[in-house]
Structures are given as C-alpha cells and as structure tokens.
C-alpha cells in the first residue's frame, strides 16, 4: 500500500470512530476540511472535522474543543450548534468560510445544503474570493 493510501485508510477509520462517538450529540452534519479534504495531507497532518449537532455543551469553549472527541488519534474536531455555525457565516468569520469552501460532508441530514446556500449567497453578495492564504471581500 502506498503511503498516501495508508494515510487515507487510517483517516477513514478515525473518522468512522468519531461518527460513532458523536451519535449521542445528534449530529446534523460532519464536515471534513483542511489538508485531508484538499488532498495535500502528509504523515504529520491532523484530520480536521467540523461537527454541527443539536446536543452540544452549553459552554462555547467546550463546544469548540469537544474534549471527549479529541482522544481519537490525529483527529481535531470543532463543534457548533446549527444556528451558531450559520451565524459564524453571516458574521463572515473566515474559519467558517474555510470549512464550507473546502469541506466535504461526511454525514448530513440536509443541513449542509442550507449552510452551503448561505455561504454561496454571501460570496455573491460581497464579492468574496478565496486567496492562497485568506479571503478577499470586494463589496463590504
């Protein structure tokens, strides 16, 4: 097995474990983003996931870090409530833009389509373009 294929197989196994562990949180969508979504991952890359679910900790820091999910090797997961993530988009927080622009939904109940639609509307309305190291807003 080639190194990239091995890493991809390990990532699929880790993501599967996260999906199982996330079930009590009632996930609406789980989005793979970062180097594994782009395909430019290496041996030292983390597996970046955004977990948007109905049952999240009340504390914002606990939602972002989801300590119980961080025990899975190489997985870095950030949690959001559905309305909270949509608000991040509307507030034009570029982390949310990165997640949607390069993200691949791993599981979804239809929420991702709503998120993607909101993202596409903002990109059109504000003339937003992705740059190699950030974003440009042409029409504030």
Describe each model-derived feature in a short phrase.
Residues 50-52:
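Short hydrophobic/aromatic beta-strand micro-patches
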Residues 1-29, 38-43, 54-140:
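Catalytic core of pol beta-like nucleotidyltransferases
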Residues 33-35:
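Glycine-rich beta-strand-to-loop/alpha-helix junction loops that act as flexible
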């Amino acid at each position: 097995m080639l190194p990239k294929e091995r890493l991809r197989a390990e990532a699929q196994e880790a993501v599967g474990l996260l999906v199982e562990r996330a079930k009590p949180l009632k996930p609406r969508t789980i989005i793979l983003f970062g180097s594994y979504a782009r395909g430019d991952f290496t041996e030292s890359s983390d597996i970046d996931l955004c977990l948007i679910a109905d049952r999240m900790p009340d504390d914002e820091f606990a939602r972002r870090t989801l300590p119980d999910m961080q025990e899975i090797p190489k997985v870095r997961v950030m949690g959001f409530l559905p309305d909270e993530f949509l608000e991040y988009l509307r507030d034009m927080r570029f982390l949310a833009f990165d997640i949607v622009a390069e993200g691949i939904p791993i599981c979804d109940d239809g929420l991702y389509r709503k998120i993607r639609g909101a993202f596409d509307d903002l990109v059109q309305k504000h003339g937003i373009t992705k740059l190699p190291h950030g974003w440009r807003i042409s029409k504030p």
